């Protein structure tokens, strides 16, 4: 497929971009002291080599009161030499680079700024930090605006091609703009015109300082998705005024960090928020960028072709595959490693204070350290198991010049990833397996399906190395009645879509248990097509449609022994999963132990004592156990044996892919 819109150039003031692909600012955690590091330079250099048109880096704190540890600092001249090294590297590889000017306001943690209170438009408590900021005094406001100006000047001096003013996501400019965080009674509060004043004045000052030709971007929320706050209507008015004040390019996102409307998780449909960019585009004369959940060139091309935006962002898409633009441009889209919006390596890591990585790209953030180089000697490597660990190992070893044979006992590759196909909002995870399969095929890895690796078969094949990546098998707890006819494993249910009764109890509140509950609770709810039909034809009231969306034909209960369900679900995705389960009426019982199963349900014990939960079907989601017996069986038959992925220890997909890749580099 060709992408004529995606790879057409565009000029923003004096900045010419070779294509319409923008990598938005991401908190990466690669600059622990604020100084540019080799890690940061190598990361962005690889994306520039991969063909991105514009890379926006940041957020870059403009002062010492509105940032956090690990961000790229722009608040002092001493950071300029390091930033110059970064901009030179990116531009030497054919891309343009911009700096995002960041002031978090009430989203700043006081612990990050020496215990001082963060600043904001008003003293309104932040649900993100749990802290209440102090309202800026009237005479303090010009000084904060001047910090934006000073940071912008530093950015230009450091070689950045443009700056982006951060006016979205609930940060400081958003806080002045919104009636729920701006309760001021002076000229910066009250009417919408007054609430716009802080942002518009800031933009005007930056424009005046940088001159008429230097590109200035504005990151703006097309809708705050906060009750009582600004919608696309207000965003359009603000954008029109911002353009008059000096903005050349609008980068449109949605929501605040406090919003309960998911923005980036897997359950958000691709291109879901293009309509926000389209709204801003109707209000301004300059170009507009559409953000969020655009992670492949086909989707990006459609956004541009349909007039939804003039440019598109692919931040996590480029974290997953730095070469995405070049692959699309040269007809190799099939070999793109797609972001699947899992958040395991990026957002989950950042929110836990760790540097960002990527589930599907273990080199992310370690570009210089983890390079695929030819092996000293080609060897015959047998990989047993076609899940993510085995496939990643096979691809990496093949790239290094080894003769690789991949053997899988089932009739298809993918392992446990394929179980996600049936789960609403999780189906995109299957893309990770599809991408690995495409790369196996492209590299010419010999693949044998429907063949169990036995000691005798391995002996005849005579490999130099055997890598056991056979995954795991579901655990079977020792409970009375566990072998009953009404008991099934969650894995079997998801793989084979086994029919259950109307009342279902799931034993285990881990990720598999909760996602199985989501799968079952959605059965019988309205499909998107039917919902669209009924809405267009006004066949039912909104209340009836909501009820039909929220209730299926099964009553689902999850039983979990520990205090909290979903302990193995990522922090940045758990809230969406739990919200969906609540919406669908799934009951979750914690600190509840299963003691027996009968034909009529599950006997449990909790703090109140024993009780019985009626159920037609009991689904087991009680964890898994490593499948690695083969390693012991062939221990004296081959020169070298390794065990990776869930066969070593059941964990998540990120760990499986990382282990496969890292072992592949050492063989």
Regions found by a protein language model. Name each.
Residues 263-269, 371-373, 378-379, 419-431, ...:
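Short, contiguous acidic/charged loop-to-helix segments that flank catalytic cores in large enzymes
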Residues 63, 218, 253-257, 408-423, ...:
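Short connector loops at secondary-structure junctions
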Residues 304, 378-407, 413, 448-456, ...:
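Rossmann-like dinucleotide/flavin-binding elements
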Residues 340-354, 458, 462-479:
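Helix-enriched interaction subdomains in cytosolic or periplasmic regions
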Residues 203, 367-376, 399, 403, ...:
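Flanking helices and flexible, charged tails adjoining ferredoxin-like Fe-S electron-transfer domains
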Residues 1-384, 388, 393-404, 412:
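Flavin-dependent oxidoreductase catalytic cores
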Residues 415-463, 562, 567-591:
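N-terminal Rossmann-like dinucleotide/flavin-binding domain of flavoprotein oxidoreductases
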